[in-house]
Amino acid sequence: MLYLSEVLLQHHDIETFEQLLEVVQTRAQSEMFFKIDVKPTYPDTPANWEDRLEGAFVGIHSVTR
């Protein structure tokens, strides 16, 4: 299972929400489940951040854009 908190700890060089989406998409290739256990604190984090992260994980591009 991929935890968002783990992604944020392991990739502390991420500076934007868009970069986070890219990392989640990459990590999704080797994981089956995704747990959103924290809220990202990037200035560009959108109101629908949970939907966009879930979309990035499952590959639904209409949600990630």
PLM segments and residue spans:
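Metal-dependent phosphodiesterase/phospholipase catalytic core, i.e.
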Residues: 1-65
